[in-house]
């Protein structure tokens, strides 16, 4: 029995059972208030005029891209600029055609400079072509070391550094190249007179492979504009397109914010994180393209509900209550609400409403089968939350072998990846869902990136408030390691997980590339948000700036 999507939500909980001993996280409230409700207006006639201008500029850039030109180096520069400025989604087939031609007929010249060779390698790998990394032997000396003369070529070093982040297992030369370029680029940042110093600092913090394309585009506008050889039509296209898309995203977030405000979780469930804006930012990193508007809406609602459920299990619920909630989700029936404590009813009813909305839309499209996979993914999520709650109840610190299978599920990345497919239209088939339920390597790798990066930055806060043991505590107990040295053990598994992700994105792929991109982008979001802190839970200046640049401030034309 499915829940009807209409109806009134239950009244606020009058009693959150203060007499029961409960943990408290003291999460700070949302910093955004009702700001995004003000973006409810539709597109204007001025926007229609801008759209026409964008179409004209797109045709101009398309002609440049497809022009017969034997200068492949110039084509590489053009493609790189298109991608880094965030408008590659307009030219996907054209870019693939050009790069496929380069891959099929590529003969790497020993005379090619390190900048061009690295750029070619990166763009081809990014497109899924398994170009050999042996070409980088051309830049080694007779003793097998990278030539020291390369260190003076900062532009070339930066290009090689970016290329190394596409490495897969067994490519030792790229591991060496990463260490070599990192050392020399760090040295270059000490010379502020270097015109590339700002780019180098940014790249060392956020390499292209791990960055969010739209966020990186916002950064790259000024870099590209400062280049005297920049293409004026391409830059204008990128800026106009960014601003038009930003208006679309603002309208979407306005609608989602209104839905969230109506739920009133900030008052009904004050122990939980109020982070719907941050949730939308997260999902915008998964797909920003206009055709995925429905996918963004439902995935944002699902991740927002998951955040509330996570806090019920982590922060507020007793084990007996959590058992009841787990059983209710297993039943997935509105009648199960009667067995729940009052505060849980608000969440449970809202959860079923969200999936009812998905069900209605999928029924219209003749894709109702997708709802089964989305529900099962959420059920798996809640089961894993309950397993962790049982560990906490008895103060159990599991071994890493016991912890990771459960913690990879509670990272929510398998569930989010599954749900991200639901609204993707014709790009996804039943086989796509069967594939993700087979626990493919790329999904596991994305979850490893999420879990370990989260645990590295969040474990101290979690232990203060009485949270289930993180990977840090599990490793410390199992290996007798100190709290200071344990976090140093996790960057390597994260690096290996990124190699798995890169490997799974090489042709022939198990599923079409648009599907893999959702999983890749989920890993990218984690790298951006959790690099030095939990930017989701403890909202700081960095994430505030990211949200502002993507969702509030337009690009100056």
Curated annotation (Swiss-Prot):
Tissue distribution of the protein: Expressed in flowers. Detected in stems, young leaves and tendrils.
Cofactor(s) essential for the protein = Mg(2+)
Give the reactions, separated by semicolons, that this protein catalyses: (2E,6E)-farnesyl diphosphate + H2O = (1E,4S,5E,7R)-germacra-1(10),5-dien-11-ol + diphosphate; (2E,6E)-farnesyl diphosphate = (-)-germacrene D + diphosphate
Q: Could you tell me which Pfam families the record lists for this protein?
A: Terpene_synth, Terpene_synth_C
Cross-referenced SUPFAM superfamilies: Terpenoid cyclases/Protein prenyltransferases, Terpenoid synthases
Q: What is its EC number?
A: 4.2.3.22, 4.2.3.75
Q: Which GO terms describe its molecular function?
A: germacradienol synthase activity; germacrene-D synthase activity; magnesium ion binding
InterPro entries this protein is in? Isoprenoid_synthase_dom_sf, Terpene_cyclase-like_1_C, Terpene_cyclase_plant_C1, Terpene_synth_N, Terpene_synth_N_sf, Terpene_synthase-like, Terpene_synthase_metal-bd, Terpenoid_cyclase/PrenylTrfase
Q: What does the UniProt entry say about where the protein is found?
A: Cytoplasm
What superkingdom does the record give? Eukaryota
Q: Does the keyword Transcription regulation apply?
A: no
Cofactor notes = Binds 3 Mg(2+) ions per subunit.
A GO cellular component annotation here is: cytoplasm
GO biological process per UniProt: diterpenoid biosynthetic process
Q: Enumerate the residues binding Mg(2+) 3.
A: 462
Q: Which residues bind Mg(2+) 2?
A: 310, 314
Q: Which family does it belong to?
A: Belongs to the terpene synthase family. Tpsa subfamily.
Q: What protein name does the entry list?
A: (-)-germacrene D synthase
Could you read off the lineage of the organism from its UniProt record?
Eukaryota, Viridiplantae, Streptophyta, Embryophyta, Tracheophyta
């Amino acid at each position: 029995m499915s829940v009807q999507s209409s109806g009134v939500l239950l009244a606020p909980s009058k009693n959150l059972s203060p007499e029961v001993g409960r943990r408290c996280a003291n999460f700070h409230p949302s910093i955004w208030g009702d700001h995004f409700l003000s973006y409810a207006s539709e597109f204007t006639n001025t926007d229609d005029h801008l759209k026409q201008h964008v179409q004209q500029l797109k045709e101009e850039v398309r002609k440049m891209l497809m022009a017969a030109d034997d200068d492949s180096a110039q084509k590489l520069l053009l493609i790189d600029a298109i991608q880094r400025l965030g408008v590659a989604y307009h030219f996907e087939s054209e870019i693939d055609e050009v790069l496929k031609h380069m891959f099929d007929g590529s003969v790497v010249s020993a005379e090619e400079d390190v900048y061009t060779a690295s750029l070619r390698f990166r763009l081809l790998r990014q497109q899924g072509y398994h170009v050999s990394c042996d070409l980088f032997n051309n830049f080694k000396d007779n003793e097998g070391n990278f030539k020291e003369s390369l260190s003076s070529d900062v532009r070339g070093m930066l290009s090689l550094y970016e290329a190394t982040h596409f490495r897969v297992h067994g490519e030792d030369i790229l591991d060496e190249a990463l260490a070599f370029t990192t050392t020399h680029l760090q040295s270059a940042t000490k010379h502020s007179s270097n015109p590339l110093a700002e780019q180098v600092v940014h790249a060392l913090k956020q390499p292209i492979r791990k960055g969010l394309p739209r966020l990186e585009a916002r950064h790259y506008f000024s870099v590209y504009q400062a280049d005297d050889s920049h293409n004026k039509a391409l830059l204008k296209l990128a800026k106009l397109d960014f601003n038009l898309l930003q208006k679309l995203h603002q309208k979407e977030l306005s609608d989602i914010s209104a839905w969230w405000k109506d739920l009133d979780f900030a008052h009904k469930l004050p122990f939980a994180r109020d982070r719907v804006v941050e949730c939308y930012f997260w999902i915008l990193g998964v797909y920003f393209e206009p055709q995925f508007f429905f996918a963004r809406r439902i995935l944002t609602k699902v991740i927002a509900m998951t955040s509330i459920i996570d806090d019920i299990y982590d922060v507020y619920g007793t084990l007996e209550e959590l058992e009841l909630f787990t059983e209710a989700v297993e039943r997935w029936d509105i009648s199960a609400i009667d067995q729940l404590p009052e505060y849980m009813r608000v969440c449970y009813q809202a959860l079923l409403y969200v999936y009812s909305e998905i069900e209605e839309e999928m029924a219209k499209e003749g894709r109702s089968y997708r709802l089964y996979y989305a529900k099962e993914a959420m059920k798996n999520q809640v089961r894993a939350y309950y397993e962790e709650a049982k560990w906490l109840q008895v103060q159990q610190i599991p071994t890493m072998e016991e912890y990771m299978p459960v913690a990879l599920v509670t990272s929510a990345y398998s569930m989010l990846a599954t749900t991200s497919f639901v609204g993707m239209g014709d790009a996804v088939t039943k086989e796509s869902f069967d594939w993700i339920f087979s626990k493919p390597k790329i999904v596991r790798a994305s979850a490893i990136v999420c879990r370990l990066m989260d645990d590295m930055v969040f474990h101290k806060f979690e232990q203060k408030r009485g949270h289930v043991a993180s990977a840090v505590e599990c490793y410390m107990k199992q290996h007798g390691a100190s709290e200071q040295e344990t976090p140093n053990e996790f960057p390597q598994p994260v690096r290996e997980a990124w190699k798995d992700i890169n490997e799974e994105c090489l042709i022939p792929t198990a599923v079409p590339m648009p599907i893999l991109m959702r999983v890749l982008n989920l890993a990218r979001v984690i790298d951006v948000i959790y690099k030095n802190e939990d930017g989701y839970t403890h909202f700081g200046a960095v994430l505030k700036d990211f949200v502002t640049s993507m969702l509030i401030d337009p690009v100056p034309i």
